[in-house]
């Protein structure tokens, strides 16, 4: 008898931390990357959760720092023939699905995502087969193979709007893979949602009791929460949203002190947006609890300067993203549906 994969009990081995670089080494690799980007007609696309020095380099070279939805838009529209995707593997796959004519490079193809790892395609297909009457909606944080099974792909920035739209059509939903985001969307929309039970190893670690103590210490602070966090954390929030939405909330909220419950990589762009405000990390440990990710994705941390330089210089199978063409064509359908729907929201 086969055993159903249980993402709740899965323990993912973390990658080794990159070797720290000296100041001189960082300067060397920065200049090398800038030169190689020009020589290769390449542009950097970096996620908010990468390290600050990577985001800074993307800015300086005319690239993009954004959430996964805007990364997809930017990469597809940019005239560069090569995209250097600083993020995790599903982001590189998504770039290749949307831009098959372009060379897609990543600093490492071993940069995983616990949500992706927690949704193996064979088990997910069986889950969908058991509920054939439901519309399949998968989060962007999934493999190309899982996207290919879906009716829709969605990011956290438009999840509530999309599910509300599908609910208005009377559709019942399979949601995968993030259980916390699925629960949040269900609560916001009232839709009939059957959730896969995955979780982000970063957001799943935020602790309610420790956050309560921090709130008591700073009663004037607003709490900003990503909806991949547990429900108890979301319920404490003054603002809930995707990475880009949290940065927008930081600007509009009147509070001068902000407690932020998402990957601390976001602090680079958020501090730019609100230079006069104090940003505090929401706690991931306390009351005897320990943390593994400690508010920073270990796979995002693999996107170092040395690895980026090697990707641009060496190319090849160790850095280039490939997606089977038949799989790409199937995954493109729900991705295009997402982009078309997002365009209607932007007016």
UniProtKB/Swiss-Prot annotation:
EC class, as a word, reads transferase
- Residues binding [4Fe-4S] cluster are 113, 200, 297
The cofactor required is: [4Fe-4S] cluster
Q: Report the subcellular localization.
A: Cytoplasm
Q: Which SUPFAM superfamilies match?
A: NadA-like
Q: Which residues bind iminosuccinate?
A: 47, 68, 139-141, 156, 226-228, 243
Which transformation does this protein catalyse, written as a reaction?
Answer: iminosuccinate + dihydroxyacetone phosphate = quinolinate + phosphate + 2 H2O + H(+)
What GO biological process, any one, is recorded here?
A: 'de novo' NAD biosynthetic process from L-aspartate
Cofactor binding note = Binds 1 [4Fe-4S] cluster per subunit.
UniProt keyword Zinc-finger present: no
Please name one Pfam family that this protein belongs to: NadA
Mind telling me which GO cellular component terms the entry cites?
Answer: cytosol
Say what the protein does: Catalyzes the condensation of iminoaspartate with dihydroxyacetone phosphate to form quinolinate.
Report the protein name in the record: Quinolinate synthase
Q: Which organism is it from?
A: Escherichia coli O6:H1 (strain CFT073 / ATCC 700928 / UPEC)
